[in-house]
Curated annotation (Swiss-Prot):
Coiled coil: none annotated. InterPro entries: Frog_Litoria. Expressed by the skin parotoid and/or rostral glands. It is found in: Secreted. It comes from Ranoidea gilleni. This is Caerin-2.2. Belongs to the frog skin active peptide (FSAP) family. Caerin subfamily. Keywords: Amphibian defense peptide, Antibiotic, Antimicrobial, Secreted. One of its GO terms (cellular component) is extracellular region. The lineage of its organism: Eukaryota, Metazoa, Chordata, Craniata, Vertebrata.
Amino acid sequence: GLVSSIGRALGGLLADVVKSKEQPA
């Protein structure tokens, strides 16, 4: 559903932020 799609998108963004903090370019 819409909520799970939004949750998945937010989870992906959060993972990207954490990953970029752990491994700065």
